[in-house]
Amino acid sequence: PDYILTVETKGIPLAVMVARAFNKPLVIARRDSKVTEGSAISINYVTGSSGRIQTMTLTKRAIPQNAKVLIIDDFMKAGGTAKGLTELVHEMNGKVVGTGVLVATAEPNPKLINDYESLFTFHGIDESTNEIHIEPVFDTIDR
């Protein structure tokens, strides 16, 4: 990838580490635009988890045309944020080369986006025992 993209705020620490690993610049989409950042592209997207309409904004100079972009986020329920980020990259005339998330929920399935990788799958919380049911997606990691 040429750029690593995430949305503020919770995905930033993970995206910082990915950007450092790839030695690529990190771009952060905002939920609102800042006048000091210059002209921007904004899109409205529907969150997959709550079905609410939210806004996502990226300055026009953040990602050049034809840039290859890797999307990183911390958590995916239905995939609405990842889909919104994908649409934002397309509006910037960039190409999404992959989407990675730390944790994705098992349900709903399918998600609003098809092509993503997650490290863990969240199956739920057993309220009677307060146990969190989460499992790694990969059984082994090549070293």
Label the predicted regions.
Residues 23-69, 136:
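Short, glycine/charge-rich flexible loops or terminal/linker lids adjacent to PRPP-binding catalytic cores
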Residues 86-143:
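PRPP-dependent phosphoribosyltransferase catalytic core
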Residues 2, 67, 97:
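Conserved acidic residues
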Residues 22-24, 93-94:
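A short helix->loop->beta-strand "cap" motif at the edges of active sites that frequently abuts
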Residues 13-22, 86:
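Short Gly/Thr/Asp-enriched flexible loops that form oxyanion-binding sites at enzyme active sites
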Residues 9, 31-33, 102-105:
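Short, ordered loop/turn segments at secondary-structure junctions
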Residues 1-8:
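Short glycine-rich phosphate-binding loop at a beta-alpha junction
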Residues 74, 79:
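Conserved G/P- and acidic residue-centered "switch" motifs that form tight phosphate/ATP-binding loops
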